[in-house]
Design a protein with these regions (language model features):
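Amphipathic alpha-helical segments that line or abut small-molecule/effector binding pockets
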Residues: 14, 81-97, 101, 105, ...
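A short secondary-structure junction motif
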Residues: 61-69, 98, 114, 131, ...
């Protein structure tokens, strides 16, 4: 058996992501991935047990750096509003890149398959929204009236996914300039800040 290398693993992940984006999960075979990468199917099996395992690795690899940036934004200095704005700006910029949009389109296209949906849930950004909820809870603990941190976290997520992100996702517009994205993120936080009592 040949020695595994991180470079080959990355090459397989990048090639597979391109094929999944073009053909969807069910339209992609490991032979397709092997052709795209320029290797044998056996080589792919040396790194990944199945097509499902390969997709999970793509999702995890794609989300890992994102989660680090976002967690750092929430743990930064300043008021809750300042930290949420930094988070929202970072989040919106990260989810508007071509790779993130392609993975979201794939998730939507294959969402009728429960097993496939679970792959995305296990490897995606769900955990970061728990961090948002906890940041809001920590800052607003003891406020009167009480604040539903979970609901505010969901509202922020909906606002960030509902504007330019949705329009780009469906192909109705090109990715906006960075200043427009930053303003959109700030507006989303401003909208939920009225319910924060801070």
């Amino acid at each position: 058996m040949r020695r595994k290398t991180e470079a080959k693993r990355t090459q397989i992940l990048e090639g597979a992501a391109r094929v999944f984006e073009q053909r969807g999960y069910h339209g992609t075979t490991l032979n397709d991935v092997a052709r795209e990468v320029g290797c044998s199917k056996v080589t792919i099996y040396n790194y990944f047990e199945s097509r499902e395992d390969l997709l999970k690795a793509i999702i995890v690899q794609g989300s890992r750096p994102t989660m680090g940036y976002l967690a750092a934004a929430l743990q930064g200095e300043g008021s809750l509003i300042d930290r949420l704005k930094t988070f929202a700006r970072t989040y919106l910029i990260l989810v508007m890149n071509d790779y993130s949009l392609a993975m979201m389109r794939l998730m939507i296209a294959e969402s009728a398959n429960h097993k496939f949906s679970q792959i995305f849930a296990d490897g995606s950004e769900h955990d970061i929204w728990q961090h948002v909820r906890l940041a809001i809870e920590g800052w607003t603990r003891g406020c009167s009236p009480s604040v539903d941190a979970g609901e505010l976290s969901k509202t922020l997520r909906s606002l960030l996914h509902g504007g330019s992100h949705f329009q780009c996702l469906i192909g109705a517009q090109a990715t906006p300039q960075i200043d427009a994205l930053l303003a959109e993120a700030d507006t989303a936080v401003d909208l939920i800040s009225t319910r924060l009592n801070v």
